[in-house]
Amino acid sequence: METNVDFSSISSKLYRKYAQHVRNLKDVCVSKTVMKPGAFFDSLQQMMEEEAAATTPPRDLSSVADYAELFKTLEEYPANLQKMPKKRELQRTNSTLLRGADESVAMGINTSNVSLSLTRLEEQRSAVDVYNDFKGFQRKLAKIYDEAAALDTTESIYKQKLTQLHGFAQQLEKLMPTGGESPPDAFTSEQQEKLLTIAANMEQLNYLRSNSLQLPNPNEILATGSLAARLEMFVEVLTYTLLQVSSYNMAMI
């Protein structure tokens, strides 16, 4: 009676007990041999001859009955092979396969069409939602167009301002002296002192205005000759003069 030996249990016990000597066990149990090329090819030739002798029929075919038996064996195909069908049968088989393929494709198309038609209506967007999205898109486009137009308007305004500044700079260049001699002072020393006095009086007047102090009536100014009232009238004259000069400069530009 043959005894079944579980080599996996034996190997697991050996690996568990002699884990550190696994390499030594392999070297002892496995014999390694290296053959020379000549000896390898001689042994290969011998193995091929032995294989050919095993598959070659033991006797020669000498009679018609032996040949008939051989052809009968060739006509019988094993289970994993199929006999090659004739040409007419092959054409009939191909046409059947093509017809079946066309029917399967048509069936798949019909199935997809049916699945599309069975899609729930609530999963599809309504016409109202599409129209609302379109109107929102139109509003965004109009807003972007207005912003672009505003930018163009601002750019044109800045261009006009730059043109005016360029003209003003040209006018200033014309007014600047070109000779090497230093130009005379615009005001004499006495005039400068008067202007400084006027500026100090204007500061006092601004202080009076900022503190809401009451000034006398112009009729009282003429009657009494108050200094503060006279300064008030002088400031009004200067303001009018400055406005006229500014208007003239703007007209020149």
UniProtKB/Swiss-Prot annotation:
Record has Transferase as a keyword: no
GO BP annotation list: cell division; mitotic spindle assembly; mitotic spindle-templated microtubule nucleation
Record's keyword terms, sorted: Cell cycle, Cell division, Cytoplasm, Cytoskeleton, Microtubule, Mitosis
One annotated Gene Ontology cellular component of this protein: HAUS complex
Superkingdom field: Eukaryota
Subcellular location: Cytoplasm, Cytoskeleton, Spindle
Quaternary assembly: Component of the augmin complex composed of dgt2, dgt3, dgt4, dgt5, dgt6, msd1, msd5 and wac. The complex interacts directly or indirectly with microtubules and is required for centrosome-independent generation of spindle microtubules.
Job description of the protein: As part of the augmin complex, plays a role in centrosome-independent generation of spindle microtubules. The complex is required for mitotic spindle assembly through its involvement in localizing gamma-tubulin to spindle microtubules.
Name of the protein in its database record: Augmin complex subunit msd5
